[in-house]
Design a protein with these regions (language model features):
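Positively charged n-region of N-terminal signal peptides that target proteins for export
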Residues: 1-4
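Bacterial N-terminal signal peptides
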Residues: 6-17
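N-terminal leader/linker segments that initiate helical-solenoid repeat arrays
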Residues: 18-83
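Helix-start (N-cap) detector for alpha-helical repeat units in TPR-like alpha-solenoids
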Residues: 24, 61, 113-114, 157-158, ...
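Short coil/linker segments at helix-helix boundaries
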Residues: 34, 42-45, 69-111, 118-148, ...
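Solenoid-like repeat scaffolds
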Residues: 51-56, 200, 239, 280
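Amphipathic alpha-helical protein-interaction segments enriched in hydrophobic
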Residues: 157-162, 202-219, 288-295
């Protein structure tokens, strides 16, 4: 009996696949850094190679949401570059959504934040490609994905970034839940969280589109300095009554420092910051080229 057990132990340590090694933190970090550099094809290749290495649901979920993230960003940038048709993009986005959904079902810890977010991102892009009516139809599901992402990790900036766009672009009551004031608060929350992460060295690059979307939402709201001071002060009660991180982010301006200027003046400063920063770089990624183009258009 003991000899049989010893033989099984020896077999497990010598035959590939019988014991699954854990994915190391260095491997996760490499994948995430490649993502930040928009090297998504490389990310997908590495993830494919690690599929047989994952040990347990948490690691498998980590592979899945990272695959969904890479797939989504590949699709998004290929659409912008004119390298992918909208029909093909819709098919691929459906698969991306399914991948993120699988990650959300099996993951634990902080992983659901990313899983829910990338499922929502794929859903949002599908709605955008299909037109206004489909975007309205998907809005509630997208908001729920963003809410779940924020619940899983309140310090994760992405759901607030997308919520800022969602609440800005949707019509308000009674058609939908669009709200320009909430859009600004969501965008400001995303920028502040990103600034904290960037300053702490948790992300290697600035997400310039965060600042552009905040500027866009400020311009759309268009409050004067005096009105800002008065109405933002009135948000405090709503912030205190909010029960979840996502709801509190809707009134985030009540609890953060706001520049003593109008919405338009702050938006102009943000756009100038983005334009000057990107124009000073020797080489821009496709994503940053798009962001610079958007910033210039809004600054006109």
């Amino acid at each position: 009996m003991h000899h049989r057990l010893a033989a099984l132990v020896l077999l497990a340590t010598t035959v590939p696949g019988l014991i699954t090694a854990q994915i190391t933190s260095e491997q996760w970090n490499e994948i995430d850094l490649l993502h930040e550099r928009d090297r998504h094809a490389e990310v997908l290749s590495i993830l494919e190679g690690l599929e047989g290495t994952a040990s347990g649901d948490t690691e498998r979920a980590g592979l899945l949401w990272r695959r969904a993230r890479a797939e989504f960003n590949q699709i998004d940038l290929a659409l912008y570059a004119g390298e992918l048709s909208e029909t093909d993009a819709m098919d691929r986005l459906a698969q991306t959504q399914a991948t993120a959904d699988e990650a959300a079902r099996m993951s634990s810890g902080s992983a659901p934040a990313q899983a829910h977010f990338w499922r929502g991102a794929a859903r949002a892009k599908q709605g955008e490609l299909q037109g206004v009516l489909n975007a309205l139809f998907m809005a509630d599901d997208l908001r729920e994905d963003l809410r779940l992402s924020a619940e899983a990790d309140p310090e994760y900036s992405n759901p607030y970034y997308v919520a800022g766009q969602l609440y800005q672009r949707l019509p308000g009551f009674p058609i939908s839940f669009g709200d320009g004031d909430a859009a600004v608060s969501f965008s400001r929350r995303a920028v502040d969280l990103h600034e904290e992460a960037y300053s702490a060295g948790e992300v290697p690059l600035r997400y310039w589109d965060y600042y552009v979307r905040l500027a866009e939402n400020l311009n759309s709201r268009g409050w004067s300095q005096r009105r800002r001071e008065r109405l933002i002060a009135n948000m405090s009660e709503d912030y205190s009554a909010a029960e979840t991180p996502f709801e509190r982010a809707m009134y985030y301006e009540a609890v953060t420092d706001i520049p003593d200027q109008s919405d338009a003046a702050e938006a102009a400063e943000l756009l100038n910051f983005v334009i000057e920063s990107l124009e000073s770089q020797d080489e821009l990624s496709l994503r940053d080229e798009r962001t610079l183009s958007d910033a210039r258009e809004l600054a006109r």
